[in-house]
C-alpha cells in the first residue's frame, strides 16, 4: 500500500501537475504537496487540533515500520461556529513536486451568467454602514467586508490547467485545492499571497498583509503607487491593527518574537500590499503549525478588531455566508511542522458553477468606491488564472 510521507522532490519541468478529481494540493516556497486518495480524513466542527493530532498519530502508528512522517492537508472555515466544518485529510498517496513550466493554450470557457452579491451600490452602502459603526468609538477598530461574484460557465473547469496557471502566476504564493465532496466536482481552490503561519522546529514565521493598491504597467507610475501605499496613513493604520493582534496572539506562545517597527512592500502580479515579516521561537515545542493557525485565525486582515465584536458586525452587513473564504488552508506533519495560508484569492467550484470572493479592510478614512475597486482588483487575480474576463 502506498503510504503518505514526506517524499523526495519531483521536478515538474515541461510536465503537468496531473491533478485528478478528488486530489488535493498545497504549494509553498516553490514546492507542493499533491495528495491522491484518502488514508484518513475527518470533518470536525470543534476540537480541530485534537482531531488532527489523532489522525496523525493513527497514521504514524500504521507507518511505524516504514519510519515515515505523515502529512495532513487541511482547510479551516472562516467561522468555526458557522455551517462549514473543518476538512482534514491524510492522503493515501503523497507527492512533493515543483511547479510545472509547461506552456498551456488559452482557456476557452465562456461565462454564461455573472452575479455580484452585493452589487456595487449594495457593497458601498455596507462600507458606509461599517464606517458609521467604526465612528461610534465603542472599541471596534476595523472591519473587513467581502463580496462574491458568481459565475456560470459553459463547461466545467479543467482543474489541472487552473492550478497550473495559478501556481505559475503566483510562484511565491500559496496555491491550493481542497475537495469538498467525494464526487470530485466540488472544490475550494485559489492562490493566496498571505502566509498565516509557518513552523519549522521551534521557529515560527508569520507574514500578514493588509493595505493594498493596484499595480500599474508603467514602471515609474508603479513605483509611485507603491510609495504612496507605504506613506498612506489609512493603509498604515489598517496594517498596524493586524500586526498588533498577531503580536497579542503570539507573545504568550513564544520566548522570542521579532516584529519590525515598519511594514514593507510585498507585490503580486496585480497588487501591492503592506506586509510585516514576524519571526519568533516557540516556548513549547509541542505546539504544532495547526495549533498556531488556530490561535491566529482569523486575523484582522480578514475579520476585524476586536474579533469578538467584528465577527457579528460583519455577519450583519454581509448578505452571504463566507464558508471557507477567509479561512485557513495548509499542511501539518506528525512532527508539528507545517505551513498555513490565509484562504483568499479563491473560488468555490461546483462543476461549471463558481463563486469567487474578495474583501477589503475598512477603517476610519476608507472610501467606499475605492474599497469596491480594491475587491475587484483582488477578484481579477483568480479570473486571470481561470482565463475568464
Go through the PLM ranges and name each one.
Residues 277-389:
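Conserved hydrophobic core element of enzyme catalytic domains
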Residues 129-130, 134-135:
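N-terminal leader/targeting segments and the immediate start of mature chains
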Residues 72-76, 143, 175-178, 322-330:
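A short glycine-rich, hydrophobically flanked beta-strand micro-motif that places a catalytic Asp/Glu
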Residues 23-46, 96-121, 125-128, 147-154, ...:
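Contiguous alpha-helical scaffold segments within structured protein domains
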Residues 34-90:
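Glycine-rich, N-terminal phosphate-binding loop and its surrounding beta-alpha-beta segment
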Residues 17-39, 67, 84-86, 152-237, ...:
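An anion-binding catalytic pocket shared by soluble metabolic enzymes
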Residues 1-50, 58-59:
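An N-terminal JmjN-like helical accessory module and its immediate linker preceding a catalytic domain
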Amino acid at each position: 500500500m502506498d503510504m503518505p510521507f514526506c517524499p523526495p522532490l519531483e521536478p515538474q519541468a515541461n510536465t503537468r501537475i496531473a491533478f485528478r478529481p478528488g486530489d488535493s494540493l498545497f504549494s509553498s516556497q516553490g514546492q507542493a504537496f499533491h495528495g491522491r486518495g484518502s488514508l484518513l480524513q475527518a470533518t470536525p466542527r470543534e476540537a480541530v487540533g485534537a482531531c488532527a493530532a489523532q489522525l496523525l498519530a493513527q497514521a504514524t502508528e500504521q507507518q511505524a515500520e516504514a519510519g515515515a512522517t505523515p502529512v495532513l492537508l487541511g482547510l479551516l472555515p472562516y467561522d468555526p461556529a458557522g455551517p462549514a466544518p473543518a476538512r482534514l485529510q491524510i492522503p493515501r498517496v503523497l507527492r512533493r513536486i515543483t511547479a510545472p513550466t509547461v506552456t498551456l493554450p488559452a482557456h476557452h470557457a465562456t461565462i454564461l451568467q455573472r452575479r455580484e452579491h452585493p452589487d456595487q451600490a449594495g457593497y458601498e452602502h455596507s462600507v458606509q454602514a461599517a464606517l458609521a459603526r467604526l465612528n461610534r468609538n465603542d472599541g471596534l477598530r476595523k472591519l473587513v467586508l467581502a463580496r462574491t461574484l458568481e459565475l456560470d460557465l459553459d463547461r466545467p473547469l479543467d482543474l489541472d490547467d487552473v492550478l497550473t496557471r495559478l501556481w505559475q502566476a503566483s510562484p511565491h504564493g500559496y496555491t491550493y485545492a481542497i475537495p469538498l465532496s467525494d464526487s470530485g466536482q466540488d472544490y475550494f481552490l485559489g492562490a493566496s499571497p498571505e502566509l498565516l503561519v509557518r513552523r519549522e522546529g521551534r521557529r515560527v514565521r508569520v507574514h500578514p498583509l493588509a493595505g493594498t493598491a493596484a499595480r500599474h504597467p508603467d514602471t515609474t507610475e508603479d513605483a509611485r503607487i507603491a510609495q504612496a501605499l507605504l506613506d498612506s496613513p489609512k493603509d498604515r493604520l489598517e496594517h498596524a491593527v493586524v500586526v498588533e493582534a498577531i503580536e497579542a496572539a503570539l507573545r504568550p506562545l513564544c520566548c522570542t518574537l521579532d516584529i519590525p517597527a515598519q511594514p514593507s512592500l510585498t507585490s503580486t502580479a496585480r497588487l501591492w500590499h503592506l506586509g510585516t515579516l514576524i519571526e519568533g521561537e516557540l516556548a513549547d515545542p509541542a505546539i504544532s503549525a495547526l495549533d498556531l493557525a488556530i490561535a491566529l485565525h482569523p486575523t484582522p486582515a480578514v475579520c476585524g478588531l476586536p474579533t469578538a465584536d467584528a465577527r457579528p458586525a460583519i455577519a450583519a452587513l454581509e448578505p452571504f455566508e463566507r464558508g471557507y473564504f477567509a479561512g485557513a488552508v495548509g499542511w501539518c506533519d506528525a512532527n508539528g511542522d507545517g505551513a498555513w495560508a490565509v484562504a483568499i484569492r479563491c473560488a468555490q467550484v461546483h462543476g461549471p458553477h463558481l463563486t469567487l470572493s474578495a474583501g477589503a479592510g475598512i477603517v476610519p478614512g476608507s472610501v467606499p468606491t475605492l474599497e469596491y475597486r480594491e475587491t475587484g482588483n483582488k477578484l481579477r487575480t483568480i479570473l486571470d488564472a481561470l482565463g475568464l474576463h
